[in-house]
Swiss-Prot record:
It is an enzyme of class 3 (hydrolase). GO terms for cellular component: fungal-type vacuole. The lineage of its organism: Eukaryota, Fungi, Dikarya, Ascomycota, Pezizomycotina. This is Carboxypeptidase Y homolog A. It is found in: Vacuole. It holds the Pfam family Peptidase_S10.
Length: 543
């Protein structure tokens, strides 16, 4: 049976997988050409010695197909750039950088920090009636262009349905790495979903009910985004996100004065600590960052990988998926996995982190996935193997590939795909998967509130592991936070007032939530509960 590396998709993951679930494989074209970068990488490994070389040898021995058939390169997307006359506004980063002001010391300084000269932001006001998505709500679409590196990130902005002059602004990020945030828009929390007739359906529980929301396709070559280059680590992607937000708020200062939050799921557990840290590192900025929210995230692998066996074997609140022998095999593999992750944490070297990712994903995620059970929802089987277990993802992709849809939003690529598995491999083979980005969270907690929430039916980024890493995190409030018990989280208003929707613990700027009856994508499975906690979080209830 062929075993392949993991993928956090939608923010969800597909680890070691037999043919019946989505796996990582070679592109249909150019396989021979794309295999060369990995061969070159393996040649470089011959210069290593000691533990690093031993780890690579061990991984290659256990999982030869991983090493032989997974390139670290991605093909550029076919695209046709629209003329500047198509866009309503083009914000030049060089113009933003050219603005100087007098600082408190009386010396001249830039109005806004950051290296923005190479960036432009293209903006088009989208006609909601053209697509029937949230008619009456102001919308903008466009691209952030990095002209030096030929990178072009697509975004779609929806104004708040309620009070856009005062409601906060939220950036939403799906995970992967390599999955489009437009999946989150149409499958989870956006103003419309797509039905089996490939038609948009109004979402009463959209997150833009009381907030303006930006959905961003990042990194490049994801969704409607494209590039001739590649981004293969989270830190590089953070520079692009800072540039996009800076130029967007420069064009729309009416939103810049409002509170801003970053939310996302799954691999956004990597993205968000980095992106928020990047924003906060710029003292002179026009981004009013107030908090971050991470749903069913992968943030601290060393802690979280402890909880795959318990979740799969009946200790997470749902019946066991695996038999005793499989559970024992996961127990047997865990010490070696943790040792490899510790080495990755200690060195942050790609040579150490890559084999840790491959070994641990195959050893601890593989047994579960080979059962055919949905890795994103422990309650059922994988229903649609061609669309990451969800038929709805296929509907979304079909809709976004319609010519009239691409024309209406100004998309420049010839086609849309929900997830780009080349990007996933790029991140994995650059060691990004296992790197300890959770170490940035204490710095965030010094300045802003952090919410970690988790649907309790998810396997891949399960609530047990997310709760555990928040309790293990070293920060000044750890002694007070860690021992706190979970308390009931209930709906406060409407006809369902008093209904239990989950559990919560909170101290200082740190909050953890368990959401009942939801898998990896909480807003899709529990739309009312997700909007309830989202609105209350933005309202500052727990900070």
């Amino acid at each position: 049976m062929r075993v392949l590396p993991a993928t956090l998709l939608v923010g969800a993951a597909t680890a070691a997988a037999p043919p019946f679930q989505q796996i990582l494989g070679l592109p249909k074209k150019g396989a021979d050409t794309l295999a060369k970068p990995l061969h070159d990488l393996q040649e470089q490994l011959k210069t290593l010695s000691g533990e690093a070389r031993h780890l690579w040898d061990e991984v290659a021995n256990h999982f030869p197909n991983n090493m032989d058939h997974n390139p670290v390169f991605s093909l550029p997307k076919k695209h046709t750039r629209r003329p500047d006359s198509h866009w309503d506004h083009i914000v030049r980063g060089a113009d933003v950088q050219s603005v100087w002001v007098t600082g408190a010391s009386g010396e001249k300084e830039r109005e806004i920090d950051g290296k923005l000269e190479a960036y432009d932001l293209r903006v088009k006001k989208t006609d909601p009636s053209a697509l029937g998505i949230d008619p009456g709500v102001k919308q903008y679409t466009g691209y952030l262009d990095d002209n030096e590196n030929d990178k072009h990130l697509f975004y779609w902005f929806f104004e708040s349905r309620n009070d856009p002059k005062n409601d906060p602004v939220v950036l939403w990020l799906n995970g992967g790495p390599g999955c489009s945030s437009l999946t989150g828009l149409f499958l989870e929390l956006g103003p419309s979903s797509i039905n089996e007739k490939i038609k948009p359906i109004y979402n009463d529980f959209a997150w833009n009910s009381n907030a303006s929301v930006i959905f961003l396709d990042q990194p490049v070559n994801v969704g409607y985004s494209y590039s001739g280059a590649a981004v293969s680590d989270t830190v590089a992607a953070g520079k692009d996100v800072y540039a996009l937000l800076t130029l967007f708020f420069k064009q729309f200062p009416e939103y810049a004065k409002q509170d801003f939050h970053i939310a996302g799921e799954s691999y956004a557990g990597h993205y968000i600590p980095v992106f928020a840290s990047e924003i906060l590192s710029h003292k002179k900025r026009n981004i009013n960052l107030k908090s971050v929210l991470i749903g069913n995230g992968l943030t601290d692998g060393l802690t979280q990988y402890d909880y795959y066996r318990p979740m799969a074997c009946g200790e997470g609140g749902y019946p066991a998926v695996l038999d005793e022998a499989s559970c024992q095999s996961m127990d047997n593999a865990l010490p070696r996995c943790k040792s490899m992750i510790e080495s990755c944490y200690n060195t942050e070297s790609s040579w150490i982190c890559v084999p840790a990712s491959i070994y641990c994903n195959n050893a601890l995620l593989g047994p579960y996935q080979r059962t055919g059970q949905n890795v994103y929802d422990i309650r059922g089987k994988c229903e649609d193997t061609s669309n990451l277990c969800y038929k709805g993802m296929g509907y979304v992709s079909e809709y976004l590939n319609k010519r009239e849809v691409r024309e209406a939003v100004g998309a420049e690529v010839d086609g849309y795909e929900s997830c780009n598995f080349d990007i996933n491999r790029n991140f994995l083979f650059h060691g990004d998967w296992m790197k300890p980005y959770h170490r940035l969270v204490p710095g965030l907690l010094e300045q802003i509130p952090v919410l970690i929430y988790a649907g309790d039916a998810d396997f891949i980024c399960n609530w047990l592991g997310n709760k555990a890493w928040t309790e293990a995190l070293e920060w000044p409030g750890q002694k007070e936070y860690a021992p706190l018990p979970l308390k009931d989280l209930v709906i406060e208003e409407n006809e369902h007032k008093g209904k239990k929707i989950g559990q919560i613990k909170s101290h200082g700027n740190f909050t953890f939530m368990r959401l009942y009856g939801a898998g990896h994508m909480v807003p899709m499975d529990q739309p009312e509960a997700s909007l309830e906690f989202f609105n209350r979080w933005l309202g500052g209830e727990w900070f």
